[in-house]
Regions:
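Short beta->alpha connector loops at strand-helix junctions that form conserved
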Residues: 27, 55, 74-76
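Hydrophobic beta-strand scaffold residues
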Residues: 23, 51-52, 71
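Acidic, PIN/NYN-like endoribonuclease modules and their adjacent C-terminal/linker elements
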Residues: 1-6, 10-20, 38, 60-128
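Residues lining hydrophobic/aromatic ligand-binding pockets adjacent to catalytic sites
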Residues: 35
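A short beta-strand-loop structural module common to alpha/beta enzyme folds
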Residues: 22-31
Length: 128
């Protein structure tokens, strides 16, 4: 299940829908508007295999790694967010929910940076 934070711009949400990427957005299809950051992790733990995309870099923390979800911080301009979500979901290392679970990821023009569950070092990957 792909979840967008409520801070994702409507234009980017519509692009993802136009590309037929099945998404649910906090405050639209799931939960409520105004949900606090500290309420998001408990919400994700109640959902089935969620991948959560946010523009909020506060979620890029090794301490947030958990086997039941994936957190993805999209660190690009707002108007590029949908393109980076699609690019990430097509990446061979992250193209299934099983491959994504247990990671906290930051997407940027420079590449993909991630924390893996039980890992002591940040990993970086190139876009392919």
């Amino acid at each position: 299940m792909i979840i967008l934070d409520e801070n994702f711009p409507e234009s980017q949400r519509q692009l993802l829908k136009a590309w037929r990427i099945p998404i649910r957005q906090i405050g639209v299809e799931i939960s409520r508007k105004g949900i606090q950051d500290e309420e998001i992790i408990p919400l994700l733990l109640r959902l089935r295999q969620p991948t959560f995309f946010t523009l909020d870099d506060d979620f890029y923390s090794r301490s947030l790694c958990h086997a039941r979800y994936c957190l993805v911080c999209v660190d690009v301009a707002q108007y590029e967010a949908a393109a980076f979500v699609r690019r990430f979901l097509r990446h061979k290392d992250f193209d299934t929910e099983a491959k994504r679970r247990g990671t906290v990821i930051r997407l940027s023009h420079a590449g993909i940076f991630l924390w893996l569950l039980h890992s002591e070092k940040e990993v970086s990957l190139n876009w392919e």
